């Protein structure tokens, strides 16, 4: 399981190992991406938390003015880690709009060619929240094949949930 890092009691009460330290570029900004693995497997599975100082190191998941950029950076950071470390999963399971751009990115961003063809499964827990953003946010995306912009579009906006529906291989 890969999730964003939030500054909550769980991260302070458990020990983590740094398994990846890299950098991503979003428009005119560069962000450090740290992937932390929980050491004890107390949850019964491997838990990886993605920490991006300035975006994914805050108290809460929601309520910030740059929420769209936060979740873009999370998805970009995860795919950068998997590509850089040559980790090719059989399936990427994407939940809600927070990871709805992953199926698009692995097929349309040359940076992630290593992951091209990985099967994706989408789960929608709440279709009311779609992560819709203005097209000017496209400048924060990793470079993608522009001719496929229609996969991102829903009623004139970038809509990560709609993108997931259009691009995922299967749903549950």
Residue ranges and their predicted role:
Residues 1-172:
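Catalytic cores of nucleotide-sugar-dependent glycosyltransferases that transfer UDP/GDP/TDP-activated
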